[in-house]
A protein has these predicted regions:
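C-terminal beta-signal and adjacent terminal beta-strands/loops
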Residues: 43-45, 128-131, 182-195, 221-280
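Outer-membrane beta-barrel signature, preferentially recognizing the C-terminal barrel domain
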Residues: 1-36, 88-103, 110, 157-162, ...
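Repeated loop/turn-to-beta-strand initiation elements of outer-membrane beta-barrel proteins
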Residues: 28-33, 115-118, 174-178, 226-231, ...
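Transmembrane beta-barrel domains of outer membrane proteins
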Residues: 11, 21-25, 96, 106-110, ...
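Gram-negative outer-membrane beta-barrel transporters
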Residues: 36-193, 270-274
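Extracellular loop and loop/strand-boundary signature of outer-membrane beta-barrel proteins
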Residues: 5-8, 89-94, 141-155, 197, ...
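Generic long, charged, amphipathic alpha-helical segments
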Residues: 179-184, 191-216
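Transmembrane beta-barrel architecture of outer membranes
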Residues: 17, 163-165, 213-217, 266
Length: 280
């Protein structure tokens, strides 16, 4: 069990952000194609985050430091941390910082083909680094751990090295269109399998790992100017979210609803009306 929540004593974060971007639009070679590549490098000082419940337990056992052990509250009698009132205090505070870097890629292609228009789009993100500095170094550790490609009690939400969305669509000149979208989330390992002394124990526990996840969505549309109708199915193959034991991911409720699709197949219908403005 964890006691989580905000902290009114937390101070503002400070960040240094560096970005470099490149846009390609080779209209003379491939008309209708546009691609953008952006590199980012962000360093946050005094970051508002948590030390992590598992890190707190690990470092208490390794160092015996009151800085960690004072946050471990075992249940009376049983000394448990998951029943009878036992918990680890894991509220937010200003830690040493967070460093992250990666590359975002977007591309699109639009062109009239046959009796309509073809459209392709792609959005991908490569996470090169995501490092958390707890600001608490010990005799055995430097207080920093890397979360790229991991999830769990310390790294929390899955941070796959690669994720993307791709869409293929075609719209006829008379207004009917169809598109299919694919969503991909790369595989992540349980953070306690890490050999980083600040993070994991190096345990061989593949049961906590999450394999790559893929979802597909289908949308049909019809343009009845000024009304546009849309009928679609998200997660058309009714793929269930990856299930992990609750103790492998902190307070995630056996999956990560903020990352994966927790609902399954769902159908939607929408209508939009476009208003025109008259110039007087």
């Amino acid at each position: 069990n964890q006691f989580i929540g905000g902290n009114p004593d937390a101070e503002p974060e400070k960040a240094d952000t560096y970005t470099v971007g490149l846009v390609l639009e080779p209209d003379a070679i491939v008309p209708g194609f546009v691609m953008a590549v952006d590199y980012y490098d962000i360093s946050i000082e005094n970051a508002i985050s948590t030390i992590g419940a598992q890190t707190t337990i690990n470092q208490c056992g390794i160092t015996g430091d009151a800085l960690f052990c004072d946050n471990v509250n075992r249940a009376p009698g049983s000394l448990a941390l998951w029943v009878n009132g036992g918990f680890v205090n894991n509220t937010t505070l200003n830690i040493g910082g967070v460093e992250t870097s990666g590359v975002d890629i977007t591309a699109s292609y639009n062109r009239s083909i046959g009796a309509g228009r073809l459209s392709l789009s792609f959005n991908g993100s490569w996470l090169n680094d995501f490092t958390i500095d707890t600001g608490i170094a010990t005799a055995n550790t430097d207080g920093r751990y890397h979360c790229t490609g991991l999830h769990g009690n310390n790294c929390c939400t899955p941070l796959p090295e690669w994720r993307h969305q791709a869409r293929l669509g075609y719209t006829f000149d008379f207004g009917f269109g169809a598109s299919i979208r694919g969503r991909h989330f790369g595989a992540v390992d349980w953070d306690q399998t890490s050999t980083d002394d600040d993070l994991g124990t190096g345990a061989d526990a593949s049961v906590g790992d999450i394999s790559a996840q893929n979802y597909f969505d289908l949308t049909l549309s019809y343009d009845l100017d000024p009304v546009n109708l849309r009928l679609g199915v998200n997660n058309i193959f009714d793929k269930e979210p990856p299930i992990i034991a609750s103790n492998y991911g902190g307070s995630n409720g056996n999956t990560y609803v903020e990352t994966y699709d927790p609902v399954g197949r769902r159908i939607f219908l929408s209508a939009s009306l476009q208003f025109y403005t008259l110039a007087l």
